From Swiss-Prot:
Function noted in UniProt: Involved in oxygen transport from the lung to the various peripheral tissues.
Tissue expression as described in the entry: Red blood cells.
Any single biological process term in GO: hydrogen peroxide catabolic process
Gene transcribed to yield this protein: HBB1
Family stated for the protein in its record: Belongs to the globin family.
Keywords: Heme, Iron, Metal-binding, Oxygen transport, Transport
Cited Gene3D superfamilies: Globins (1.10.490.10)
PROSITE patterns: GLOBIN (PS01033)
UniProt xrefs under CDD domains: Hb-beta-like (cd08925)
One CC-aspect GO term: haptoglobin-hemoglobin complex
Residues engaged in binding heme b: H62, H91
One annotated GO molecular function: peroxidase activity
Protein name: Hemoglobin subunit beta-1
InterPro entries registered for this protein in UniProt: Globin, Globin-like_sf, Globin/Proto, Hemoglobin_b, Hemoglobin_oxygen_transport
Length: 145
């Protein structure tokens, strides 16, 4: 659960970030920093270099899609597990994504968010946003239990 202040900080952060851009950058960084994640994106074409990843339209599109899902999840703070139930099942039973990657992605989302918000990404906002991301990660991992 989230306090009123945490909820306000989460809404504030999600309301200020350029969702498409943060998603594209975060997914690109995930793939670049954690090269084993490339196996999940074989259909995306060339992921052979930083340049290729950063300019890959499929990476950008999928990253934006993921971030839109996270931004929409803000409306479901009280029941993230239900909100992500279907997506959790897909990632577990169809895509076979290692749930540890959700945590890696969440950390990168926080970093990229900080890059975009600068000094407006205060320690309090970061703490609330990262708590939210941890809950999203846990909700996505539900299908694995």
């Amino acid at each position: 659960t989230f306090t009123n202040d945490e909820s306000q900080h989460i809404h504030d952060v999600c309301g200020k970030i350029p969702v498409d851009q943060v998603g594209a950058e975060a997914l690109g960084r995930l793939i670049l920093v954690n090269p084993w994640t490339r196996r999940y994106f074989k259909s995306f074409g060339d992921l052979s270099s930083a340049e290729a990843i950063q300019h890959n339209p499929k990476v950008a599109s999928h990253g934006a899609k993921v971030m839109h899902s996270i931004a929409e999840a803000v409306k479901h703070l009280d029941d993230l597990k239900a909100y992500y139930a279907d997506l959790s099942t897909i990632h577990c039973k169809k895509l076979y994504v290692d749930p540890a990657n959700f945590k890696l992605f969440g950390g990168i989302v926080s970093i990229v968010t900080g890059m975009h918000l600068g000094t407006d990404y205060t320690a309090q906002k970061q703490a609330a946003f990262e708590k939210f991301l941890h809950h999203v990660e846990a909700a996505l991992a539900t299908g694995y239990h």
